[in-house]
């Protein structure tokens, strides 16, 4: 009888712990997103990073981190986070768009062309951005 009560107690405790842990994962992302929307990028970066610790496949946290690093003009970390988003979800249009812009900026034109082709094949929401990307690439190529 005592063993049964002990087992039930342990299972109940584990259940509550896992539920609390799942809620904290969502809280980190939600807090980070609110801070980002309020332009508190340094604070939001901390919570996005914390969300990634508990949820390493959080493509949205990586995407927001890339946007933060873009604002900080840290091209390497922006690129790393965008590449991580695309590893997690190769059809993430916003990541493809931002990575294309970054590659045009870095004069990596072959990669930019490849990403525009990818964007063309996967686009659903951001198809209107493809001509803009092509124009940026073409104008940069003409000026070189």
Labelled PLM ranges:
Residues 37-38, 71-72, 105, 122, ...:
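Register position in tetratricopeptide repeats
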Residues 24-50, 54:
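Alpha-helical segment of the N-proximal tetratricopeptide repeat
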Residues 37-46, 71-84, 106-115:
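Structural signature of tandem alpha-helical TPR/SEL1-like repeats
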Residues 51, 84-85, 118-119:
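Canonical positions in the second alpha-helix
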Residues 64, 98, 132-136:
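Canonical tetratricopeptide repeat
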